[in-house]
A protein has these predicted regions:
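Non-catalytic terminal and connector segments of soluble metabolic enzymes
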Residues: 46-53
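C-terminal accessory helical subdomains adjacent to catalytic cores in phosphodiester-
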Residues: 1, 14-43, 56-216
Length: 216
């Protein structure tokens, strides 16, 4: 059984991996584990989630030094991409070109062939939007919210096209419409409702990364 780890930004990403990806990986004889980035060490233990790039860099280098991993993945949002990270200084570019350039910069900085980074367009909540567009979320979100989000997704050209504005990124839209929305509760329930295949069908950037991860 191949061993694959994915360094993730926080608890939402960890829950996405556990909910959508682990069983699919197991079916391909892959042992998959999400690892939340450690941001600090305190007497109470490690703090995890987000933070500056130095935390990612330290942990990525540590994982890449371990020979038992067949693949080391990374899952980090395009929205709020950490300053100091490879490719951060790149100027805005048409369409998704800057995201592709950032991924290329990450691969150049960490040239280990086992390393496969994903810079999520534009946040991990894009997967939730994909599930909502496919019919998920009824009973968990109001019909008004669902209708509003479907219009936004269609106007943008798909859930991964919902942009990275301070008030218009996927998570900000969800929270503005549904103040009680829980990233690791409501969102994960919606994903569980529709399943992985539906999300992959509507999120081609995420799907391409996932299929590459499986085939390595």
């Amino acid at each position: 059984m191949r061993q694959v780890c994915i360094l993730v930004e926080g608890q939402t990403e960890e829950a996405v991996v556990k909910t959508l990806l682990i069983d699919a990986a197991k079916a391909r004889d892959i042992y998959l584990i999400p690892i939340i980035v450690r941001t600090s060490l305190t007497p109470a233990g490690a703090s995890r989630g987000g933070g500056s790039w130095k935390h990612y860099d330290r942990q990525l280098n540590d994982l890449l030094s371990q020979s038992h991993w067949d693949v080391i993945g990374l899952m980090v949002d395009y929205y709020g991409y950490p300053s100091g990270a490879p490719g951060f200084e790149l100027p805005e570019a048409p369409g998704d070109q800057r995201q592709l350039q950032i991924v290329a910069a990450l691969k150049e900085h960490y040239p280990d062939p086992r390393f496969h980074p994903l810079v999520v367009l534009h946040e991990i909540e894009s997967l939730i939007l994909a599930a909502i567009r496919a019919g998920g979320g009824r009973g968990l979100l109001s019909e008004k919210t669902i209708e509003h989000l479907i219009r936004a997704i269609d106007d943008a050209g798909g859930p991964e096209k919902i942009n990275n504005g301070e008030k218009t990124s996927p998570s900000k839209r969800l929270l503005a419409l549904e103040p009680e929305y829980g990233k690791t509760s409501t969102g994960i329930s919606i994903l569980r409702e529709v399943g992985l295949a539906v999300v992959l069908d509507r999120c081609p950037v995420f799907a391409a990364w996932w299929r590459t991860l499986l085939s390595c």
